[in-house]
């Protein structure tokens, strides 16, 4: 049995809205206008053939009878005022226009000339349109408020039901002929609640299936009701007053009056271009703000409680530091001036007193310091003989002799503490005798003390004590080369440089890692698909089986080539 494929219907929900926006934008910018209308006094107006041909049978017949190769067509109306034709274009493109009451007859005659026929019109005569549409033309400068109960019969059908339902539609004005104006001095001027009538209102495409009703109903939002009733007698006597009339399409009540609209005649019912969808809401066709999204809706609301985010384990995200280009930052000239770390003798004494547990490794030092403090040792009894020194160090500490100095106090004297040491005359006289004795210290320890670093005990129990302190930040290190490497953080010195790029490093290990990772394609050589990769030196012709061998080769044989000072060689 043959299977039939199901038919799918694709619907574009915003199709009508997009068409209206495009046609409105084309009308405002007159692009691409392919129809030129020459009115009285040779005033030219630009429009589109598609819109006018769909609305006017006269224009459609002229375009069908005249076959022109040129894309632009000119139609002459020498007896038609350009102002009224401009109102007509606003009405056809946007579905509504704002005119004065005495211009309705002229506009209707123009509609009859273009064979645009309709049995039902809807007009709105409102007092508050005087304030909003007062600057339409120069002749409408002085306006008077009209009565709320003022009725005008214009020889057309009046629909009283639509008057009450469509009172909110009376505030919509044309974008090009309606500007915001201050309230008039006379009474009866209404203040519009929503600022819907702006200088640049959105125009929509004229729908040929819409019914144009003619009705004259007062608006429901008039503020000064008592003043309007008091001035109604004066306004009735002045029949020549210019009263603006809103001539708009019935967009909001189409669904409610569908039965009545089927019986009425439509504009351009015989045209082939009258198939535009009518499912467009009134807010999208009359309000500019309805065609765009509100920006405040896209703003996320702040969370009420931030503790849930902080306590959630999914939010512990570790973001790596941005890798800066090496060699172009932290130069010698950009370093901030550092102040040396000031040693405090009292803090050192408190640190020593906090370690109350006896340590066997410091027994000999405590014994010697105790004898020095009490005068038991002097320069005559001390000899350079090492056996005598060792025998002296093997004596047990006497419990009767108090220990005034900590075990680490001897090994934390620095050159910047000479002033504190000189303040102790009793201890300074005893220490002067130690300069003549040979304690058998290793030369490495003496060299470190000469450089201004701290010397610790040589026994294995004190190996974990950090001996070398940074003069800038006070950080301690157990090895002298670690302190030397750390000082480059403060000084900005980068003694190692890559010869293959501009990178500079503070440590040799960082440079070797850079060579093996960034420049891996340079040091890697391939002898074939079956053989393993070999690593060649970038400074000579030697090759190695592993990266570790290449690193040892670069660190040993080409150590001078890794230094920044030898870049010019």
UniProtKB/Swiss-Prot annotation:
Gene3D superfamilies, sorted: Classic Zinc Finger, Potassium Channel Kv1.1, Chain A
Record SMART domains: BTB (SM00225), ZnF_C2H2 (SM00355)
GO cellular component: nucleus
Entry keywords, A to Z: Developmental protein, DNA-binding, Metal-binding, Nucleus, Repeat, Repressor, Transcription, Transcription regulation, Zinc, Zinc-finger
BTB domain residues: 33-101
Zinc-finger recorded as keyword: yes
Region (Disordered) location: 179-276, 304-336, 438-462
Biased composition (Basic and acidic residues): 197-206, 251-263
Biased composition range(s): Low complexity: 223-248, 447-462
Record function comment: Transcription factor required for terminalia development. Negative regulator of the JAK/STAT pathway: represses JAK/STAT-dependent expression of ventral veins lacking (vvl) in the posterior spiracles.
PANTHER family: B-CELL LYMPHOMA/LEUKEMIA 11 (PTHR45993), TRANSCRIPTION FACTOR KEN (PTHR45993:SF7)
Protein name stated in the entry: Transcription factor Ken
Species this protein is from: Drosophila pseudoobscura pseudoobscura (Fruit fly)
Origin organism lineage: Eukaryota, Metazoa, Ecdysozoa, Arthropoda, Hexapoda
């Amino acid at each position: 049995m043959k299977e039939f494929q199901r038919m799918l219907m694709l619907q574009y929900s915003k199709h009508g809205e997009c068409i209206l926006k495009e046609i409105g934008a084309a009308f405002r910018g007159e692009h691409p206008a392919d129809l030129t209308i020459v009115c009285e006094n040779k005033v030219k107006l630009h429009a589109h053939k598609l819109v006018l041909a769909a609305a006017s049978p006269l224009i459609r017949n002229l375009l069908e009878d005249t076959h022109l190769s040129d894309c632009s067509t000119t139609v002459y109306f020498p007896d038609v005022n350009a102002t009224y034709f401009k109102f007509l274009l606003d009405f056809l493109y946007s579905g509504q226009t704002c005119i004065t009451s005495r211009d309705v007859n002229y506009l209707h005659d123009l509609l009859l000339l273009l064979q645009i026929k309709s049995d039902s019109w809807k007009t709105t005569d409102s007092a508050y349109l005087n304030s909003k549409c007062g600057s339409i033309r120069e002749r409408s400068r002085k306006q008077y408020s009209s009565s709320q109960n003022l009725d005008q019969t214009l020889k057309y059908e009046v629909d009283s039901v639509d008057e009450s339902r469509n009172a909110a539609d009376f505030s919509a004005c044309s974008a090009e002929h309606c500007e915001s104006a201050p309230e008039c001095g006379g009474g009866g001027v209404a203040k519009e609640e929503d600022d819907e009538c702006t200088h640049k209102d959105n125009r929509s495409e004229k729908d040929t299936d819409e019914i144009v009703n003619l009705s004259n109903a007062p608006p429901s939002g008039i503020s000064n009701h008592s003043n309007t009733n008091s001035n109604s007698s004066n306004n009735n006597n002045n029949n020549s007053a210019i009263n603006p009339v809103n001539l708009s399409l019935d967009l909001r009540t189409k669904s409610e009056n569908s039965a009545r609209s089927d019986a009425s005649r439509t504009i351009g019912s015989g045209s082939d271009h009258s198939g535009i969808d009518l499912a467009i809401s009134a807010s999208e066709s009359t309000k500019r703000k309805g065609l765009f999204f509100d920006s405040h809706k896209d703003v996320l609301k702040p969370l009420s409680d931030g503790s849930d985010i902080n306590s959630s384990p999914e939010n512990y995200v570790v973001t790596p530091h941005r890798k800066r280009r090496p060699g172009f930052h932290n130069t010698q000239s950009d370093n901030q001036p550092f102040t040396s770390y000031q040693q405090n003798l009292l803090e050192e004494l408190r640190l020593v007193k906090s370690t109350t547990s006896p340590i066997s490794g410091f027994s000999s030092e405590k014994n010697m310091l105790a004898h020095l403090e009490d005068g038991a040792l002097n320069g005559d009894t001390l000899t350079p003989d090492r056996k005598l020194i060792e025998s002296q160090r093997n004596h047990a500490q006497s419990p009767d002799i108090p220990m005034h100095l900590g075990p680490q106090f001897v090994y934390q004297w620095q050159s910047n503490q000479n002033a504190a040491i000189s303040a102790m005359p009793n201890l300074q006289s005893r220490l002067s005798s130690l300069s003549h004795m040979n304690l058998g210290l290793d030369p490495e320890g003496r060299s470190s003390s000469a450089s201004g670093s701290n010397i610790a005990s040589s026994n294995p129990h004190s190996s974990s004590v950090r001996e070398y302190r940074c003069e800038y930040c006070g950080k301690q290190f157990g090895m002298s080369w670690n302190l030397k490497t750390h000082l480059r953080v403060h000084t900005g010195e980068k003694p190692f440089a890559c010869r293959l790029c501009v990178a500079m490093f503070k440590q040799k290990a960082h440079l070797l890692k850079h060579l093996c990772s960034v420049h891996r394609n340079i040091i890697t050589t391939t002898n074939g698909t079956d053989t393993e990769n070999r690593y060649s030196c970038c400074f000579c012709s030697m090759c190695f089986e592993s990266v570790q061998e290449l690193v040892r080769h670069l660190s040993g044989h080409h150590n001078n080539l890794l230094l920044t000072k030898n870049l010019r060689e």
